[in-house]
Regions:
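Anionic N-terminal interaction surfaces
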Residues: 2-16, 21-33, 37-112
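Acidic, Ser/Thr- and proline-rich intrinsically disordered linker/docking segments
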Residues: 3-10, 127-194
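A broad, low-specificity signal marking well-ordered, structured residues that form hydrophobic/aromatic
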Residues: 96, 115, 148
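Generic structural motif
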Residues: 101-107, 120, 153-155, 163-166
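Conserved beta-hairpin
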Residues: 107-127
Length: 194
């Protein structure tokens, strides 16, 4: 397919998503809430049978890859949270469990930087500032599309970190929930990531 026909097809339905893909995305969202290999397999099969070109379903393929990575992380979670080696000074003596490039779209300057999830806090390093949110102060951690959202217990602050991929958002939100749950309990066992 030529560039012109691709642009023309896209301009015929700007911002519109085929109802079959909307149904698939709803099924994906349900699968993310209760991830299983069976659900991922059914989603992959359903996506293949929809009959769209790979260009038309590249976002859905990325969503499916993110679900698979979440499953891998959950399976390896029996050995504890992954530990990433980082020489970042802001981490200090904390164990780092996640690192990904992100932006903060809700901030006026929309800074880009890196989100680090450590044993004690979430740290954003980028732009003109560093944001540090201790796990004991986080009331809720979740994902929304490619975003990791941390909401403070006092509900006065919401931190939205936009990831470059669904996989990063799903993995980061999962690890954040684990770290929030253990924020005031005994240290979490950790597995070294190779």
């Amino acid at each position: 397919m030529g560039l012109f026909s691709w642009l023309k097809r896209r301009s015929e339905r700007p911002g519109r998503v085929d109802p079959k893909l909307l149904d698939w995305r709803s099924a994906w969202a349900r699968a993310v809430e209760q991830p299983s290999a069976d659900a991922a397999g059914r989603l992959a099969e359903a996506l293949d049978t929809l009959g769209f070109s790979e260009e038309d379903i590249e976002v859905e393929r990325e969503m499916l890859d993110g679900l698979r990575e979440l499953l891998d992380l959950r399976r390896s979670g029996d050995a504890g949270l992954p530990i990433l080696e980082t020489g970042h000074r802001v981490i200090g003596s904390d164990r780092c469990h996640f690192s990904a490039p992100v932006s903060m779209p809700d901030e006026d300057s929309q800074p880009s930087g890196r989100l680090l999830l450590t044993s004690t806090r979430a740290v954003f390093v980028g732009g003109a500032r560093t944001a540090s949110i201790p796990w004991h102060a986080v009331g809720q951690a979740r994902h929304e599309q490619r975003d990791i959202i941390l909401i403070r217990k006092n509900r006065e602050n919401l931190y939205r970190f936009r990831c470059n991929s669904f996989a990063d958002a799903l993995r980061g939100a999962f690890l954040s929930r684990q770290l929030v749950a253990h924020g005031q309990r005994a240290p979490i066992p950790s597995a070294t990531r190779s």
